Amino acid sequence: MGFTKPDLPAIEGFRSVLADLADVIARNRQGTIERLDPEFLHGLRVAARRSRAVLAAGGRVIPDDVRREARLGFALLSDLTGPPRDLDVYLLGWAAYTEPLGPHAAVDLEPVRAHLIRAQDEAYATLTTWLQSEEALDRLASWRRWLTGPLPEVLPDRALDPLGPYVAKRIRRAQATLLDEGRAITAESPDEVRASSEDVRYL
């Protein structure tokens, strides 16, 4: 993604970053549909999750109706890309997982591998169906129109603030949340800490 100037109006900086991420999704969409390489899905998924993190940070910059609709779309895309990506990782690492167990164990586990392949095919089919659907195409097109079109006359109260200080405050807040959750971590809460660490990384 390109760099943004810290003195840029916050809404322009957010739109620039989100437009870069939309480009990443567009570049990886067809390769994901055709299953040319697992990295296409990985790139698409990361861009969708980063878009969600940027939208979450833009509560006083991006109009509420725009942000709400975009977050719904990216949440759906994140949900649909999760299963096939997880199965890609499992199957790409299968040899490394099973080799230490010896050749006999690897043979015994072949039905498990076959099951994972079937599940992978089903997960990709579900994702591909949605990526080619009218809903997905409409969402992507309307999102692109908002990112590149004129700004609305009425904007949230921090939309025209300088980008740098606004983002710096959000990063400090996300870091503080991560540290608080890390200090209070329990066996039941690692997912919360993981999610917060991703928020910091994506910002």
Regions found by a protein language model. Give the residues of each.
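Cationic, histidine-enriched alpha-helical/coil surfaces that engage anionic ligands
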Residues: 1-203
